């Protein structure tokens, strides 16, 4: 249980407090001595104690006031020694009342700092913080009794002026920095994507990326050499005029155009190697390309998948777009076309069913899926030439169920020159199954291909004479069709059929690529391998008969 203090205990505690000495605030502020020695002295300082303290400070300097008792034997605490030195014994200490200048400085410092006596004493040498505090407290009481303001009006006006000056200096500095930024052109307006798009649409020569796309450039380079060159020149001119607006974009497009030019040169060399070359007109000095599956005005090349000599026509030649295109696809995207490997023979036959033959007075209403419109003009022209003029004998072959609707081939006057040259080199019948200038490789005895017939091509033997002639300067490159062979698929006449991975054996494809990558591809084409065996695989058998007619320019 807690013991309750009795009245006798309280009286004893009170008596002890009365008997204990009272500390002098002015002379001592330290704690009583806790050791076994004599207690610390309190009260006013004597002259002997002042002399001991001054001598110690001169020897050891100010600081470490607690060591004075140990080193000098002075029975005073450290706090009492410090206050005696600072307030009474310092050599630079000022005695007496404050001057008018010191009073004005104290008022100004107090208006700025407040009750920071030690900081104010640093601005008043020889004056202690205690003296400054006593002066300020005495002044406040006097002003309150007189009803005067604590700070005079002059000090208040000076303080307000200083505040306004500081604010004005800050504003001037901020305005100066803004002026410098504007003078140096460093003003950065707000930028949004909407404004950029609106400004780019208003540019006079801001080209779109689609205008110089890879597919368009490739399609133009395969369609016409002059068309590709002029388009690239126009696009380059537009890019040069827009260099000041979009320099980074023009550099990128120029790099694309240069890479496409290099690809066009490589593709030209490849076309010459596989017989995909220009057709030389007898009455024209320009080269007009006839791509696979298509034809030009006045030409009868590749009507039914077989090569025939072209006939010069009267009147200007009209450059047409290549007919190697689907009605549902982009004309310039034929490189992306691939043959679906899962199609059955019946699916390949259906789109190419032959329509009834048209009369000479009425154009045929049938249109090939690849030749929309252009094939009808060729049929109409062939019928007109056959009925109106007495030219060479037209050879009409029976069409297979996989061939295109038109199977009529007209022999041109250059056909006689080719026939004479072939008879000089190879005596014998001219129109045979190995003649490269025959208008149609299939005769009437060729049986039609049914829907279930397999598309298998065998290796055919060639005679030494033929192999020797094929190894000469006038190289002939074309497939040999045996009477039992089937007709190739029309879609395999497309240029991309050479590169389809699902139509040829890998070894045959590698041999074909090795032949294409040989030296001087445009002149020296070596189709004969080994002991006079020519590959009639699906990829090379699908190629039409082609021949370089450089001597008949």
Swiss-Prot record:
It is found in: Nucleus. Induction: By gibberellin in aleurone cells. GO terms for molecular function: DNA binding. It holds the Pfam family Myb_DNA-binding. GO terms for biological process: anther development; cell differentiation; pollen development; regulation of DNA-templated transcription. Residues 1-45, 464-489 are annotated as: Disordered. InterPro entries: GAMYB-like (IPR016310), Homeodomain-like_sf (IPR009057), Myb_dom (IPR017930), SANT/Myb (IPR001005). GO terms for cellular component: nucleus. This is Transcription factor GAMYB. Residues 37-89, 90-144 form the HTH myb-type domain. The gene is GAMYB.
